Amino acid sequence: MQFMIMQTLLVQALDAACRKAEQNGLVLTMEQRQMLCVQREQTLRNAGRLEVGLGVLPALIETFSQSPYLDKRNAVQELTELQQIFYAAQNLTHDTLRDADLLAAMRSLYDGLCGGDTAELAAQSEEVWRREAKKHSGR
């Protein structure tokens, strides 16, 4: 029962995030949203993580839909890679960064230093994540 409630809340949060993303030109179909949810579960398993609550996916969609570098034609793949990077960075920093701060740091690096290159973003060190997140903390 609790699982069904969380799934319903996740779907509602995704719908709200996707409505906001549409304002930035990112339109995700229901099939693409479902694919992102499946990828989310796989990413969590691969990262050895368990997520309580709605997780980062809705906020990640909202945050990166504003990026000029996000390839809207290949958004599911890029958003999946960004989810993987988020959880890898959380593991690397031992979950000491707030989700919002890490997302802001990711976006700053993705749009700046990395020029939209997810491989470059994934290669960042713990020190870089901490420094960038600190710049964005409390916003």
Across the structure, where does each feature detected by a protein language model lie?
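N-terminal interaction modules that seed assembly of large macromolecular complexes
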Residues: Q2-L57
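Short intrinsically disordered terminal tails
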Residues: M1-M4, F64-Q66, K135-R139
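Charged, low-complexity interaction regions
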Residues: A21-E31, N46-E51, P68-R73, N91-L97, ...
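Generic detector of well-ordered alpha-helical segments enriched in charged/polar residues
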Residues: Q7, V11, D15, P58-I61, ...
